Amino acid sequence: MVLGKVKSLTISFDCLNDSNVPVYSSGDTVSGRVNLEVTGEIRVKSLKIHARGHAKVRWTESRNAGSNTAYTQNYTEEVEYFNHKDILIGHERDDDNSEEGFHTIHSGRHEYAFSFELPQTPLATSFEGRHGSVRYWVKAELHRPWLLPVKLKKEFTVFEHIDINTPSLLSPQAGTKEKTLCCWFCTSGPISLSAKIERKGYTPGESIQIFAEIENCSSRMVVPKAAIYQTQAFYAKGKMKEVKQLVANLRGESLSSGKTETWNGKLLKIPPVSPSILDCSIIRVEYSLMVYVDIPGAMDLLLSLPLVIGTIPLHPFGSRTSSVSSQCSMSMNWLALALPERPEAPPSYAEVVTEEQRRNNLAPVGACDDFERALQGPLFAYIQEFRFLPPPLYSEIDPNPDQSSEDRPSCPSR
């Protein structure tokens, strides 16, 4: 793109936290500057900003219409959270012939401040998923007579804060499952699993203490394991698309027939993942801890405990500060760097990352028939500017595998 005498057009935000990352919450004031550097005198019709926040989902499904006829069904939905426009220089004008109303900008660097308030109503946390995203951005447009406009778009991050210091998220989570293996007319003893964690809410970087007891009364060698899964759900036109993604796992010791293993606070660390999204009508992001027993030649014995990944960490002694932004900075390692500025080619603005581009960057992944196959899949490769990377490989697994639950007998004597 030829800019002529316009050397650069950039956007900078006034950050509210010590991490120097533009992160905001509902009700915050977003302020910053549009920075313009020119190498000579230019005439300007207007310098505008457009700020917008929205959630959007999109996926396609192939349908069979019969008689060897197939078609593609598109599912799309969008929720807008805010839409703000302002003119920093000049005014709305489409007439290039009139000399009136043009502003002259001299050679050098110039700053133009902008400011707007985010809605007080809850906003969805910024997110980039396989079939949808939640994005917030500011776009600057410099309009000059007889020239194509210079446009630039820069994103900022919004957190809908989740404070894990609430009674519902501090409550312990526990469960028990049992499975009896059958082979033709021979029935072996049961395999039983009990697991408990101290609370439901955690923040990225914390380690979950897992307390579990696994009793193997079967004739097979089994292996106890645990994993954290992220579930992304996308909603459009009355349909739902769900994707499950493995984010962390651990493996216990092999357990022979008649043996019992106890986990007394076995640690599983939560990697730098996106917080839970629970208040968006078209995108939902949830987490769960799967404690399970890998059984060769049979379906795994699986126990699922719900998790909520929050943004405000645990305060065991009740020491709270009034600044939510300062609390947020304690758990923001997953953001690392500010989101980059993204210039666009005139005359129209293209999406930073289109859905088609994301699909082209995805390697095909078949559905997993067994939980263990999913665990052997790729882990979440999380690096600095996570929101504009192609999504990682996903494993779509049955959220309700065939399991049995019976009263727990003791192992038979041998």
UniProtKB/Swiss-Prot annotation:
The gene is Arrdc3. Belongs to the arrestin family. InterPro entries: Arrestin-like_C (IPR014752), Arrestin-like_N (IPR011021), Arrestin_C-like (IPR011022), Arrestin_domain-protein (IPR050357), Ig_E-set (IPR014756). One of its GO terms (molecular function) is beta-3 adrenergic receptor binding. Detected in visceral fat, subcutaneous fat, brown fat and skeletal muscle, and at lower levels in kidney. It is found in: Cytoplasm; Cell membrane; Lysosome; Endosome. GO terms for cellular component: early endosome; endosome; lysosome; plasma membrane. A motif (PPxY motif 2) lies at residues 391-394. Adapter protein that plays a role in regulating cell-surface expression of adrenergic receptors and probably also other G protein-coupled receptors. Plays a role in NEDD4-mediated ubiquitination and endocytosis af activated ADRB2 and subsequent ADRB2 degradation. May recruit NEDD4 to ADRB2. Alternatively, may function as adapter protein that does not play a major role in recruiting NEDD4 to ADRB2, but rather plays a role in a targeting ADRB2 to endosomes. Residues 405-414 have a biased composition (Basic and acidic residues). Induction: Up-regulated by fasting. Transiently up-regulated during the differentiation of pre-adipocytes. A motif (PPxY motif 1) lies at residues 346-349. It holds the Pfam family Arrestin_N. This is Arrestin domain-containing protein 3. Residues 393-414 are annotated as: Disordered. Its main location: cytoplasm. The keyword Cell membrane applies. Disruption phenotype: Mice are born at the expected Mendelian rate, but there is important perinatal lethality and the majority do not survive till weaning. Mutant mice have considerably less body mass and accumulate less body fat than wild-type, in spite of normal food intake. Heterozygous mice display higher oxygen uptake, increased activity levels and higher energy expenditure than wild-type. The keyword Amino-acid biosynthesis does not apply. It is a peripheral membrane protein. Keywords: Cell membrane, Cytoplasm, Endosome, Lysosome, Membrane, Repeat. SMART domains: Arrestin_C.
